[in-house]
Amino acid sequence: MQKSVLAGLISSALVLVPIAAARADTSVTCMYMLMRVYHAELDHCHIALSKDREDRYQRMKAGMEKFIHANAKQDPNAIISGIETDNIKRALAGLKSCQSDDFKYAIQALDEVTTPDHEKMVQGTLALPRDPQIGDCGT
């Protein structure tokens, strides 16, 4: 339940806020973590994104990693590996089944964040240098 509430709040931050507000207010590290977690859940359940969505996902992932490496005030490798070792593993351990509401939400969220419009929003966000850990992760 907590995951669903958090995911809903974060989805709003990533998908529904105006582009200018998202650029200023959303943590790049948060966006990166959510994309990685949702993608890992789909991988775990053997669900592939369409080629165009996977290509957008990979471009956004690479762009966010580059941004984190260029702008992080803390060790960027530790930030990225922490997402892998903590957030992704915890999400997969908490995934009840590939039929659960949480998993269905992951599919929906990743569909929303792999649209061309969302990729453009992310590109705009990454054009504004700042600490990638500063910003909201769900309002």
Predicted features along the sequence, with ranges:
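C-terminal segment of classical bacterial N-terminal signal peptides
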Residues: L14-A21
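Immediate post-signal-peptide N-terminus of mature secreted/exported proteins
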Residues: R23-D55
